[in-house]
């Protein structure tokens, strides 16, 4: 039997099972996540999204540094958005929660349930990763990226792709803990840049900062000549994100 003959046998009649109809109705649930999330997060600007591992223990230096960064951001007037779960996400929410600005958690429903951390002024749960990531991007004026795994890399690279391709306005992308990120950045330079997969200037999208105080300074420095509100030419980008 050839591969061409095998394919029909391996593809069930999804129409007969009502699969296609269920998929169509599922779109309404996706739309509801976008609408509800957008409405709930409208009051929080300016906000900074903090990404990082769910597995970082509270006694780990990364956790403590994240909490310090979030507290300083919150006291400076920035809402802080995290993934709403444990680890770095909890540290970000905790620092903001005890600061002066709202702490926002965007939780995700997973097969192995991710419990929302208790340090959230606004908590929103999503079923779909892409709707959740949209909120991280839509409402942030900067991204702070702590050490993390696949999920953190996914969020980092999505943010960079949107900026690189002009689908999102240029905002600070700050990697914290140079020792953790240097290997990845070296690979970007020695492989992606050298083989022409990205432009050398794309590396300028990233800042690497180790000191919490300098994270806040970097965000203010980026906006000091223009303010936090979108420029006229950026409004269309944000509407079409």
Q: Can you say where each PLM-predicted feature lies in the sequence?
A:
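Active-site/ligand-binding-proximal alpha/beta "capping" segment
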Residues: 127-179, 223-228
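Generic secondary-structure signature for well-ordered alpha-helical cores
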Residues: 36-39, 78, 97-101, 111, ...
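C-terminal functional extensions of proteins
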Residues: 175-241
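Solvent-exposed alpha-helices and their adjacent loops that cap or buttress functional pockets
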Residues: 41-43, 72-74, 96-97, 114-118, ...
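Structural motif
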Residues: 46-49, 78-79, 101-105, 121-124, ...
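Short gly/pro/ser/thr-enriched loop/turn and capping motifs at secondary-structure boundaries
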Residues: 110-115, 152, 180-183
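Acidic/glycine-enriched connector segments
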Residues: 87-145
């Amino acid at each position: 039997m050839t591969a061409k003959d095998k394919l029909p046998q391996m593809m069930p009649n999804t129409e007969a099972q009502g699969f296609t109809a269920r998929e169509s109705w599922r779109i309404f649930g996706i739309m509801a996540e976008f609408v509800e999330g957008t409405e709930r997060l409208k009051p929080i600007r300016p906000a900074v999204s903090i990404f990082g591992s769910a597995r970082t223990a509270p006694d780990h230096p990364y956790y403590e540094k994240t909490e310090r960064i979030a507290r300083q951001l919150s006291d400076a007037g920035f809402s802080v958005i995290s993934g709403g779960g444990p680890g770095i996400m909890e540290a970000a929410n905790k620092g903001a929660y005890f600061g002066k600005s709202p702490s926002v958690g965007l939780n995700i429903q997973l097969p192995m349930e991710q419990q929302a951390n208790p340090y959230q002024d606004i908590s929103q749960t999503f079923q779909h990763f892409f709707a959740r990531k949209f909120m991280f991007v839509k409402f942030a004026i900067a991204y702070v990226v702590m050490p993390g795994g696949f999920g953190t890399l996914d969020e980092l690279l999505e943010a960079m792709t949107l900026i690189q391709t002009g689908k999102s306005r240029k905002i600070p992308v700050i990697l914290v803990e140079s020792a953790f990120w240097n290997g990845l950045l070296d690979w970007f330079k020695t492989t992606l840049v050298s083989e022409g997969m990205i432009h050398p200037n794309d590396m300028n999208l990233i800042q690497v900062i180790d000191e919490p105080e300098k994270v806040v300074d970097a965000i203010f420095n980026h906006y000091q000549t223009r303010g936090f509100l979108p420029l006229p030419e950026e409004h269309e980008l944000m509407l079409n994100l």
